[in-house]
Amino acid sequence: MKRSKKYLAVSQMFDIKKRYPLQEAIKLTKQSQITKFDATVECAFHLNLDPKKADQNLRGALVLPHGTGKTLKLAVIAKGEQAKIAKEAQADYVGDEDLIEKISKNWFDFDVLVSTPEMMPQLSKLGRLLGPKGLMPNPKTGTVTDNVGQAVSEIKNGKIEYRLDKNGNIHAIIGKTSFEEHKLLENLKTLYLQLMRIKPRTAKGNYIKNVTISTTMSPGIKIDPITIA
């Protein structure tokens, strides 16, 4: 793959093979921004897990202490009182059968979809549309719930979803390059502590094999996992 001059210049700022202390890695990440806009900061944890094993296929959600800096559009499938609560919580779109019908016609002007358990039998019929886009509500991520007000509030305040991919990696957005260093550090630590809390009992050897941090379109900087705890 041909890299841009900016990418190559940034890659000279650090050693791609070295594992940096967390604080230094974050400082380098903020300095390595290629784009002119406020770039997204992402981290990736490479775990010594087999996603084919049910008990090792990690998936969940958590609220980052400083959010992600990203504004998400929320759609909520609910009726009656729950629909009213969702509107009061400032969900962008709220509906029941009408909203399900709209989605069935390839309307996807939202980033996260929340549903009450009551509406899931109808919504699940759209699995082929929502599944591949990662939009199908799931109890594990708190997007199937009777407490829609809390769900909307948490997502608006920086809740992220994480899932182990087929290569054993968990990718997550932890902020923007405009964030102060301590905010990026605390967000990354929050995800790290969550992954340690849910470590499968069947996990063997070195649980966290690699951790990298990067901005949009920039090379990844390796972090020494020992410096995160």
Swiss-Prot record:
Source superkingdom: Bacteria
Keyword Cytoplasm: no
Pfam families tied to this protein: Ribosomal_L1 (PF00687)
SUPFAM superfamilies: Ribosomal protein L1
GO molecular function, one term: rRNA binding
Keyword Ribonucleoprotein recorded: yes
GO cellular component: large ribosomal subunit
Family designation: Belongs to the universal ribosomal protein uL1 family.
Function: Binds directly to 23S rRNA. The L1 stalk is quite mobile in the ribosome, and is involved in E site tRNA release.
PANTHER family: 54S RIBOSOMAL PROTEIN L1, MITOCHONDRIAL (PTHR36427), LARGE RIBOSOMAL SUBUNIT PROTEIN UL1M (PTHR36427:SF3)
Name of the protein described by the UniProt record: Large ribosomal subunit protein uL1
Gene designation per UniProt: rplA
